Amino acid sequence: MEYETVKVSKENKVATIEINRPYLLNAFNTQLILDLQQATKFVKDDNDIRVVIISGSGRAFSSGADLTEEDSGWDGSKDALIRGFKPSFENIISMPKPFIASIKGPAAGI
């Protein structure tokens, strides 16, 4: 699968989701949120995958929300959490596979 802000690879039944916005320390913008929704659904639904690793490219896992994004399309923080992040979290929580976070550098909240 091809995404704008995440890389997904699969090798030996292990999938890796790499957040790929290193120039902004992998800050979460709208596109990253949508790509992460699709990527987590893809690895959840692929029965050949047994383990999932999520990491960040560059020197940080994530610096949190992208404060430079002017029009996110969300109607406030609550809407971003419900429509944006919740589907990804639900994919991860309901996934019957180990989901490992490989964190280096900053890992800030959203």
Say what each PLM segment does:
Residues M1-S57, E90:
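Conserved CoA-thioester-binding segment of acyl-CoA-metabolizing enzymes
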